[in-house]
Regions:
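Short extracytoplasmic
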Residues: 47-69
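Alpha-helical transmembrane segments of integral membrane proteins, especially early/N-terminal helices
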Residues: 61-81, 167-172
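Juxtamembrane non-transmembrane "cap" segments at the membrane-aqueous interface
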Residues: 158-185
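Terminal transmembrane helical module of multi-pass membrane proteins
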Residues: 178-229
Length: 229
């Protein structure tokens, strides 16, 4: 009975750790100023926006600074087609208030979740015999990884089959207004976030997460098999 309880708790702890890894990798991926500049140069985005690569980099990183709590406002002045303009309109400013609140909420989930996972692991170490602790934790991580994999596969199928449905549902789930429905002609935020940039961020984030995750999964699988023998 005690072992079953610990196993369930360790699955929860593993899911919390996976969530913490996800957010940490996303945070690290986003906070790369030079990468944005190099991407704008590579895509030739300035030809479409009329804004220099330097100004676009400052503009997108101001959004990140705001989300992280390092800036009080997203607003800044940029040069667009030779004229100095305010980068963001009121809709974008109000939408980013919601985005920052969501980002900070997930940051808290990461921080408190990691602390809770550590507490659960410590508790289970005290509740189980020394000989079976590592294998039990490994089995729990493998189970949690399977749950995560199933959820990720289902999400991936949804995205592949109907991306618009996924995108709209995502925003309606986390936002209670329609500020996220922006017009390309009036919202510069959309223009400095082309599809190529978004796709590259997703790929970088996925690779950054999968590397440590797969290493942990391989280690857990090896431990579980060795202990079983």
């Amino acid at each position: 009975m005690k072992k079953a309880v610990c196993f369930t708790l360790l699955i929860i702890a593993s899911l919390l750790l996976i969530t913490a890894m996800l957010f940490t990798c996303l945070q690290f991926c986003m906070n790369q100023r030079d990468w944005y500049y190099k991407s704008y140069v590579k895509y030739g985005t300035s030809r479409e926006t009329g804004i220099s690569d330097e100004d676009m980099t400052e503009a997108i990183f101001r959004l990140i600074d705001y989300m992280e709590g390092r800036a009080d406002s997203i607003q800044l002045s940029v040069s667009e087609n030779g004229s100095v303009v305010e980068m963001y309109n009121q809709q974008e400013i109000e939408h980013m208030i919601d985005v920052r609140a969501l980002y900070q909420a997930w940051k808290n989930v990461r921080d408190y979740g990691a602390a809770a996972a550590a507490a659960i692991i410590a508790l289970c170490i005290c509740m189980t015999a020394p000989g079976g602790r590592i294998r039990l934790m490994s089995r729990a991580f493998i189970t949690a990884s399977a749950i995560f994999g199933i959820a990720l596969a289902a999400l991936g199928i949804w995205v592949a089959v109907d991306f618009n449905s996924f995108w709209n549902s995502f925003h309606r789930l986390f936002f209670t207004n329609d500020l996220w429905l922006m017009d390309y002609n009036t919202c510069r935020m959309i223009r400095i976030c082309p599809l190529q940039l978004f796709n590259d961020i997703v790929i970088r984030f996925a690779l950054m997460f999968m590397a440590p995750f797969l290493l942990l999964l391989i280690f857990a699988t090896a431990v579980a098999r060795r202990r079983q023998k």
